[in-house]
């Protein structure tokens, strides 16, 4: 009869639907709440029929979800300091100076760090469950661990944080740009014939010459020429 065939059709449809329903364990970041959520979803295709919280999270899956979040959001999610960014730039300068040959300096560019999060960050994500917890991560230690001995010592020799100038001052180098910038009062360089170099003489620094009141006077990578031309002309 028509009713029995309709009922049979309904049963068949339910059976087909039941076969298509699958349970999916979903572990992802709740953007609105800023927390990690784990749930079991009953789905047909991409349609979610129901959700229920998952307890007893698998640690590796949990850490992978956090790594995926950092990869999606970028390294800015981590507690960088200006000092750590300077350290990263110093390492990368020495690596770039080795262009064309195998470098002993690891690739610590943002792209390389994002690609290797499982290696250097994932082992330390055990206590992260909220966005605010990222601020507690000691990423300085994690990244410094990527520099094997004796490279930390060589880093200080080849890409020093400070340069000694004739006045006796120890002036900080800024590695946030390439070439690194040495902002120094002109008077402190009296007696220095040419531009300071680092990295075993391979890298000339960029001098931002300042007045006694620390106002910009000149930007140069050729101090010898500055003494001969600009400075000599100004003295006339």
Can you annotate each of these PLM segments?
Residues 154-186:
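Amphipathic alpha-helical packing elements
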Residues 5-162, 202-236:
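Acidic, serine/threonine- and proline-rich low-complexity intrinsically disordered segments
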Residues 1-2:
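Short, well-ordered junction/capping motifs at the entry into regular secondary structure
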Residues 9, 170, 178-179, 187-189, ...:
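Short, glycine-/Ser/Thr-/acidic-enriched flexible segments
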Residues 175-205, 209:
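Short, surface-exposed, low-complexity cationic segments
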